[in-house]
């Protein structure tokens, strides 16, 4: 989010881009909703913004702070990886800020469960809340027989 641009304008732009690229199969996003009150808990999605030669997709997610530490990210990641790999074998990048303890734990657990690996060549700087940090890259192979 850019603090110098209207929040609503940025959200509208994101939704338009997500819808357009989603319809063409270039991006897939889902919301995480609490079923009993329809509260928005997070987002998860794939796009083609990758840093490695091997990966076809990049997986990103966000879980609101009040919904963290309940396994929601892990369950959502596993579900989307299974969905993406239901037909073909696919390599997916996951990036994580190594200083984000909870995110790092989630990604490392996912990489371990899916027999993934660290990919230093895919490390890249990411700006979050105005702070630029080097995010570590991990690769996971998913496919019909992987999940």
Positions of PLM-derived features:
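Mixed-charge, polar/low-complexity N-terminal
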Residues: 12-14, 20-21, 43, 47-48
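A short helix-loop-beta-strand connector motif used in the catalytic cores of GNAT acetyltransferases and
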Residues: 16-31
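Alpha-helical interaction segments
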Residues: 4, 20, 51-52
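Acyl-donor (CoA/ACP) binding surface of acyl/acetyltransferases
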Residues: 29-147
């Amino acid at each position: 989010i850019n603090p110098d641009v209207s929040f609503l304008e940025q959200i509208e732009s994101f939704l338009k881009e997500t819808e357009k690229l989603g319809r063409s199969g270039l991006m897939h996003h889902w919301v995480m909703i609490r079923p009993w009150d329809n509260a928005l808990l997070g987002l998860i999605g794939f796009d083609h913004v990758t840093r490695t030669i091997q990966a076809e997709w990049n997986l990103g997610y966000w879980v609101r702070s009040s919904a963290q530490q309940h396994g929601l990210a892990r369950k959502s990641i596993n579900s989307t990886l299974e969905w993406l790999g239901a037909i073909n074998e696919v390599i997916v990048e996951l990036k994580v800020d190594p200083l984000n303890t909870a995110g790092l734990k989630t990604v490392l657990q996912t990489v371990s469960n899916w027999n993934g690996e660290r990919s230093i060549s895919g490390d890249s700087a990411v700006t979050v809340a105005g702070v630029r940090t080097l995010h570590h890259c991990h690769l996971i192979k998913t496919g019909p027989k992987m999940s």
